[in-house]
């Protein structure tokens, strides 16, 4: 088809990474900007666009990165595809955090550092989280599933995590 609308959400080096999500009203995109390209504006935001018009409804800056493994390499980039459920959009970060934002206004609802602790895996081996990058999180049977550990910036990990609505 034909282009209905087109919106430039981010400028400079970087941009929408891996995938977006929709909920019938808005399109949600996560922007990741390379740390060595400080001229990009706006840097590392989660943005919601009106699905009918392409108008930016809200943006949320990623903020200062807090990486469990230390300051380098540590990026606030939204480095994974987003996942949308009624009322919330999940975004995985290069800092190892999974965050949930309100779809209405972008308010932070929940933040969990997947790299702050080791996990006992179902096979008995200790798993470690790291960057969250690439594919989206999966929501099924009332749970959120995500991979934590990605070697793009040299921080490996190998955890497949599951969260329930109770936060477990």
Where are these regions (language model features)?
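Extracytoplasmic/lumenal domain signature
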Residues: 1-17, 21-78, 83-134, 138-168
């Amino acid at each position: 088809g034909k282009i209905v609308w087109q919106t430039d959400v981010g400028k400079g080096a970087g941009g929408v990474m891996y995938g977006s999500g929709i909920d019938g009203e808005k399109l949600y995109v996560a922007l990741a900007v390379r740390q060595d390209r400080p001229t990009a504006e706006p840097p590392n935001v989660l943005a919601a666009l009106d699905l009918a018009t392409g108008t930016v409804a809200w943006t949320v800056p990623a903020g200062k990165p807090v990486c469990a493994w230390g300051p380098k390499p540590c990026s606030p980039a939204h480095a994974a595809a987003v996942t949308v459920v009624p009322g919330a959009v999940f975004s995985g970060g290069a800092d190892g955090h999974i965050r949930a934002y309100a779809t209405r206004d972008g308010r932070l609802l929940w933040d969990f550092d997947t790299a702050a602790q080791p996990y006992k895996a179902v096979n008995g081996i200790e798993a470690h989280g790291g960057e969250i990058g690439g594919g989206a999180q999966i929501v099924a049977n009332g749970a959120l599933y995500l991979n934590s550990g990605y070697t793009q910036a040299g921080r490996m990990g190998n955890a497949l995590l599951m969260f329930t609505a109770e936060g477990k």
